[in-house]
Amino acid sequence: MPAELSAQQKVDVLQFSLGQLPQVECPLVHRFTPGLYTREIFMPKGTLIISRVHKTEHPFAVLAGRATVWAEDGGVVTVEAGHLGITQPGTRRMLYILEDCRWATFHPTTETDLAKLQDELTSTPDVGHLEGWGEAQALLRRLGVAERPEATV
C-alpha cells in the first residue's frame, strides 16, 4: 500500500476493515408511488456508515436525528432532522450517527424490483484487494471510533 493514501483510498481501507466487523441492523422502508421510489433507512446512534456510490442525481432528506457526514471532497458537516439536500452522481458518504437517524432518498423510476433498483441507483467500490487492516485500525483511532465499533457498510 502506498505511504500516502488519497482520501478515497482511506475510505476504501476503512470500508474493507469495517466489513470484517459485526454489522449493525439498519432497517429499510421502501415506498413506491407512480414514477417515484422512496428509500428510507434507520441508522442507530453510534453507527459508522459508508454509503455505496450513487449513480444518479436525487434529493435526500434527514427525517429525524443527527449525523456527521464526511464527503469525498474532504468536507465535513453535521446534518439534522429537516435537512434537505441533493446527491450528485459519484457521491459516496461516510456518516457517524450522533442521534438515532432516519434518512430518505427519492428516485424517479418505474422500477420496483429492489435488486434491480440497487444496481440501477448505486455501485460499490471493489475493496476486496485491500490488506490494510493495521492502517485502518490507526484511522479508526484517529477518528475517535472504538477499536471494534458497531458498523455497517
Question: Residues of each region from the PLM?
Answer:
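Conserved short histidine dyad/triad with adjacent acidic residue
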Residues: 34-55
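C-terminal output/interaction extensions
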Residues: 110-130
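A short, N-terminal "cap"/entry segment at the start of jelly-roll beta-barrel domains
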Residues: 1-40, 121, 132-153
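Short histidine-centered beta-strand/loop micro-motifs
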Residues: 49-54, 71, 77, 95-96
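Glycine- and acidic-residue-biased ligand/ion/polar-headgroup-sensing regions
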Residues: 54-73
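Ligand-binding loop in jelly-roll beta-barrel domains
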Residues: 88-117
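Short acidic-glycine-tyrosine-enriched beta hairpin
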Residues: 33, 40, 72-93
